């Protein structure tokens, strides 16, 4: 079996296990019972079709088990492509007092400079990873302070003996999540000696298509999403963690399973025949 076929199969195994649990839950363990819904929420039932609440019943039981799906899939790709992957990996090292102060300074400037700059008639400061990191690393004075960072995903290239850390967020992360990730990444890059060879802010999928067109505003407060080399979006992330062809293997894995499970959901849960249009696919 080719490497990318192996990655696709491993990804599908993870998704299939999760989807089978969802289907077992909504069909057997906790099905939507119309009479129970009408008895518990008579006003809602009188105003809104039962089918709307049937769909929301499924959604609630789908989103909870899929909360950590991106991390699980990334670990599978890392294990198949690089040789080792793990979620919630703890990295412990030391960072000098001066570098920690500068990390705080950089983050505070990005968080609070808007209003002050406007009062002075100045342009807001734009995030620039390369210059920010250079500024932090140029001062290594003071005591070495113990620092612990928990990585969303950690991977090792077993052949090349290289270590990678990823702050992996959903494709549309909020501002607070992104700030925390940037602080963790700056600490990883500022450790002396370094405990990982590279660390990245990663989004597993780009709903805007190309990186140049990524326009979700919240992470852009902390990173230049189009230019910062520490940012990996979509195929950049999957190729880094799994090797060439991993992104297409991921896309193919999801779309193949999507056809199968959509048919089951229509017939077994909604009780209707699927439409001719199978719906959205990942691209």
Spell out what each predicted region is.
Residues 90-159:
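Active-site metal-binding core of divalent-cation-utilizing nuclease and nuclease-like domains
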Residues 78, 151-172:
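Conserved catalytic cores of phosphodiester-cleaving nucleases, focusing on short active-site segments
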Residues 1-95, 276-283:
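Nuclease-adjacent, charged terminal/linker segments that flank catalytic cores
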